Swiss-Prot record:
Residues 142-223 form the UPAR/Ly6 domain. It comes from Mus musculus (Mouse). Glycans are attached at N117. InterPro entries: Fert-Immune_med_protein, LY6_UPA_recep-like, Snake_toxin-like_sf. Residues 1-26 form the signal peptide. It is found in: Cell membrane. It is a lipid-anchor; GPI-anchor. Its main location: membrane. Keywords: Cell membrane, Glycoprotein, GPI-anchor, Lipoprotein, Membrane, Repeat, Signal. SUPFAM superfamilies: Snake toxin-like. This is Ly6/PLAUR domain-containing protein 4.
Length: 246
């Protein structure tokens, strides 16, 4: 009888302990995507957070922002939503550092109520302020733009950029960013250290899947080699890019 009573008491203690354990509730996170290439400024860009979503159990809230600069043009692509990744503090760095085309990213995963609440580009302001400026010029110039093939990067909107000495190769690629409702294909052109893939080591930025197709211009030259000279103009190549867009 004593043993049975003791076991019953142990069971009661166990049930009480279980009842005191915190419940694993689904987390509420902001849900948003952004893809902007016009009038983007480090100081006046604002992200309106209007939607939220309920995540699956054990998922956290993610926010990933990519900031791109080439010449005087800027672009922002970003994703907010649920993530199964482990939590990690804010991480900000240059994936491709200046001079020339630069690509920086900010990303974090958190696990508290609506914690993915970044609404501005302040982290990139601080990152850019810490980067030394390069002013030594070269004799090279390249077309420069970032944006949609049929919008911001139409030939009439493409500018010519004088390249710094440390980034005197002309770069051009079509990038595709995909995450949740974010599905954006865009063109980036400008001065770079070389003309190879800039994001070869970054198939994912946070949850954003990155696809980079490089040397579209070279492909155009190869196709038209029988009809055009190798000195084909950038404006003609840009027109070909428009025809090749998705």
């Amino acid at each position: 009888m004593i043993l049975q009573a003791w076991r019953s008491l142990q069971l009661l203690y166990l049930l009480e302990a279980i009842s005191l354990l915190p419940c694993t509730e689904a987390l509420l996170c902001y849900e948003a995507t952004a893809s902007a290439f016009r009038a983007v400024s480090l100081h006046n860009w604002k992200w309106l957070l209007l939607r939220s979503m309920v995540c699956n159990q054990r998922e956290g809230c993610e926010e990933t922002v990519v900031f791109i600069e080439t010449g005087t043009s800027k672009g922002v692509l970003s994703f907010k939503g649920c993530s199964s990744a482990f939590s990690y503090p804010p991480q900000i760095s240059y994936l491709v550092s200046p001079p020339g085309v630069s690509i920086a990213s900010y990303s974090r995963v958190c696990r508290s109520y609506l914690c993915n609440n970044l609404t501005n580009l302040e982290p990139f302001v601080r990152l850019k302020a810490s980067q030394p400026m390069s002013t030594l010029p070269s004799a090279k110039s390249c077309p420069s733009c970032v944006g949609k093939h049929d919008q911001e990067c139409l030939p009439s909107f493409v500018t010519t950029e004088n390249c710094p000495f440390a980034a005197s190769s002309c770069y051009s690629s079509t990038l595709k960013f995909q995450a949740g409702n974010l599905n954006t294909t865009f063109l980036i052109m400008g001065c770079a250290r070389d003309s190879h893939k800039l994001l070869a080591d970054f198939q994912h930025i946070g949850s954003i899947r990155v696809t980079e197709v490089i040397n579209v211009l070279d492909k155009s030259e190869a196709v038209s080699a029988g009809h055009c000279s190798q000195g084909i103009s950038w404006s003609v190549l840009l027109c070909l890019l428009i025809l090749l867009r998705d």
